[in-house]
């Protein structure tokens, strides 16, 4: 298995797909990296030369990926919560952040239903 940005990428898959195993590199960024390195995107990782892998590593290292990207996202969310913006408050309460309706749905974000005991015998 080849190692790019401290991530083992699978040998038997196409390069464009294998690069997406790195957090922060999707299909479009993968395509961009391969175009800049002049490498065919349909070639398998096991067929790449060490020189090609070095090119990919050098180009990919310029982007924010893996731990740095995760840390940056966490700091952005933390900043939103500290300045008490609407989005920060929604993050803090564990509710949907992007304007979704929560009256009936949003179970993924809210978690399982919390049943409230009703009054017995009216």
Swiss-Prot record:
In terms of InterPro entries, this protein maps to: Rbsml_uS13_C, Ribosomal_uS13, Ribosomal_uS13-like_H2TH, Ribosomal_uS13_bac-type, Ribosomal_uS13_CS
For bias type Basic residues, the affected ranges are 106-122
Sequence segments annotated as region (Disordered): 94-122
One biological process term from GO is: translation
One cellular component (GO) term of this entry: small ribosomal subunit
Fetch the Gene3D superfamilies from UniProt. 1.10.8.50, 30s ribosomal protein s13, domain 2
A GO molecular-function term, please?
tRNA binding
Q: Which Pfam families match?
A: Ribosomal_S13 (PF00416)
Checking SUPFAM superfamilies in the record gives:
S13-like H2TH domain (SSF46946)
UniProt keyword annotation of Glycosyltransferase present = no
Q: Which keywords appear in this protein's UniProt record, sorted alphabetically?
A: Ribonucleoprotein, Ribosomal protein, RNA-binding, rRNA-binding, tRNA-binding
**What role does it play?**
Located at the top of the head of the 30S subunit, it contacts several helices of the 16S rRNA. In the 70S ribosome it contacts the 23S rRNA (bridge B1a) and protein L5 of the 50S subunit (bridge B1b), connecting the 2 subunits; these bridges are implicated in subunit movement. Contacts the tRNAs in the A and P-sites.
The family this protein is said to belong to:
Belongs to the universal ribosomal protein uS13 family.
| Subunit architecture | Part of the 30S ribosomal subunit. Forms a loose heterodimer with protein S19. Forms two bridges to the 50S subunit in the 70S ribosome.
What this protein is called in its record is: Small ribosomal subunit protein uS13
Q: Which organism is it from?
A: Mycoplasma mobile (strain ATCC 43663 / 163K / NCTC 11711)
High-level lineage: Bacteria, Bacillati, Mycoplasmatota, Mycoplasmoidales, Metamycoplasmataceae
């Amino acid at each position: 298995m080849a190692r790019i940005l401290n991530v083992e990428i699978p040998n038997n898959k196409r390069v464009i797909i294998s690069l997406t195993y790195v957090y922060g590199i999707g299909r479009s960024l993968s395509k961009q990296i391969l175009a800049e390195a002049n490498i065919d995107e349909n070639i398998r990782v096991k067929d790449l030369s060490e020189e090609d892998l070095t090119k990919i590593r050098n180009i990919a290292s310029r982007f924010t990926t893996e731990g740095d990207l995760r840390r940056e996202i966490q700091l952005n969310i933390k900043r939103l919560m500290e300045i008490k913006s609407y989005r920060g408050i929604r993050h803090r309460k564990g509710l949907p952040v992007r304007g979704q309706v929560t009256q009936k749905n949003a179970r993924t974000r809210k978690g399982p239903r919390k049943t409230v005991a009703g009054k017995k015998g009216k």
